A protein has these predicted regions:
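A short, basic/flexible loop-to-alpha-helix module at the beginning of a structural domain
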Residues: 1-7
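N-terminal Rossmann NAD(P)H-binding glycine-rich loop of SDR-like oxidoreductase domains
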Residues: 10-30
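Conserved residues in the N-terminal Rossmann fold of short-chain dehydrogenase/reductase
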Residues: 38, 57-58, 98, 251
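Residues in the short beta-alpha loop(s) of Rossmann-like NAD(P)-binding domains
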Residues: 40, 125, 225
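Conserved Rossmann-fold NAD(P)-dependent oxidoreductase catalytic core, especially the SDR/UDP-sugar
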Residues: 79, 83-87, 91-142, 147, ...
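Strand-loop microenvironment adjacent to phosphate/nucleotide-handling motifs in alpha/beta enzyme folds
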Residues: 143-286
């Protein structure tokens, strides 16, 4: 079992992001101290304003020196930093690999050099059914965690793997919401496609559940419900489209790196084979 200890220092890579902010709040609430490294200086400043006690370090996990500086005096690591936009990863393969593979390797090696108690990494269902660069880099990251677990048994290496988090940074939902509020046309890839979704609170809950219950570095996977892209868009239009406006959709088809249906486990069910959220449930979530 791994848990947050009072006054111990925890490194959160990518802490300026959507998931990072929620995780940092939980760590602080449990009495821990936080240092975070991220590339987005503007978001780091906002984080510092909200949580003055957090030590911020503008930097890049792909830069070994930056990781060395961030890792000093750390007791545990939450590795969130990633290049995670599926479409951009196809065009920026080098950048995606630098962040998700080289950056992860830097974090793991410096964690060993500093003898931390644990390293927990965030993966994705895209690693279970690889269709593009992003999923491939996350799969490699998972394998690195497993090898480090085998080679350095005094440190706990853990991986959580799940689907999409509602309104995460770069999510198309943020764009859809604004377009719908203005009664504008919404571009959608494939309404019949299905995806695993849940809330930011559930995502952070899984991180702590993994710390408490996972026994090795194999991906720690939750049971998740799914929704179709069409149902999600219907729920959003019912909630955000002004009265008197009709839903205007332009369908463009699946893009490079995307699957019609996702899996969380390689031998698990596709997202169109599991329990679905109802429109009402989706509206409550969004």
């Amino acid at each position: 079992m791994v848990k947050i200890e009072k006054n111990k220092i925890y490194l959160v890579t990518g802490g300026s992001g959507f998931l990072g902010g929620e995780l940092i709040e939980r760590i602080l609430g449990a009495g821990g101290k936080v240092v975070t490294i991220a590339r987005n200086e503007g978001q780091l400043i906002k984080l510092k304003q909200k949580y003055p006690e957090v030590d911020i370090l503008p930097g890049d996990i792909a830069d070994r020196f930056d990781v060395q500086q961030a890792m000093k005096g750390v007791d545990g690591v939450f590795h969130l930093a990633a290049f995670k936009h599926v479409g951009l990863a196809e065009d920026r393969c080098r950048e995606c690999t630098k962040s998700n593979v080289i950056g992860s390797l830097n974090v793991l090696e410096e964690a060993v050099n500093n003898n931390v108690k644990f390293v927990l990494g965030i993966s994705t269902d895209k690693a279970a059914q690889i269709a593009g660069v992003y999923g491939a880099t996350k799969y490699v990251m998972e394998k690195l965690f497993e090898q480090f677990e085998d080679n350095y048994p005094t440190i706990k290496f853990r991986i959580v793997r799940y689907g999409n988090v509602l309104y995460s940074t770069g999510s198309v939902l943020c764009k859809w919401k604004e377009l719908l509020k203005n009664g504008e046309q919404v571009i959608v890839t494939a309404p019949e496609a299905t995806r695993y979704f849940w809330t930011i609170e559930q995502a952070v809950d899984l991180i702590f559940d993994c710390m408490e219950n996972a026994s090795d570095a194999k991906p720690y996977v939750p049971e998740m419900k799914a929704m179709s892209v069409g149902d999600l868009l219907t729920a959003m239009s019912e909630k955000y489209l002004p009265n008197g406006y009709s839903l205007d959709i332009k369908t463009i088809g699946l893009q490079p790196g995307e699957n019609m249906h996702e899996k969380i486990l390689e031998d698990g069910k596709y997202s169109n084979e599991v329990e679905r959220f109802t429109i009402r449930e989706i509206k409550e979530m969004i």
